[in-house]
Amino acid sequence: MSKEKVARFNKQHFVVGLKETLKALKKDQVTSLIIAEDVEVYLMTRVLSQINQKNIPVSFFKSKHALGKHVGINVNATIVALIK
């Protein structure tokens, strides 16, 4: 993904993309995650290991394309992190 965004999502802030999600996890800002169902598992290993330690809830979205469109970007989104 070429640009990461911070925007409003159902009155919550969120970040889009793997790099931004990892940054938010490192800062303990993540309240929950939305992961596209068609994402390659090896891309999510670092994220999944961190969220298991922090008990962060995870939801799944039907596809990367649909997730990107739902959050208002014109590219695929593998992951969206809702932040504090």
Swiss-Prot record:
Q: Which Pfam families match?
A: Ribosomal_L7Ae
Origin: domain of life: Bacteria
Query: Which InterPro entries has this protein been placed in?
Result: Ribosomal_eL30-like_sf, Ribosomal_eL8/eL30/eS12/Gad45, RNA_bf_YbxF-like
Decide whether keyword RNA-binding is in the record: yes
Keywords for this protein: RNA-binding
Single annotated GO MF: RNA binding
Keyword RNA-binding recorded = yes
Tell me the protein family, please: Belongs to the eukaryotic ribosomal protein eL8 family.
What protein am I looking at? Answer: RNA-binding protein SAOUHSC_00526
Species whose genome carries this gene: Staphylococcus aureus (strain NCTC 8325 / PS 47)
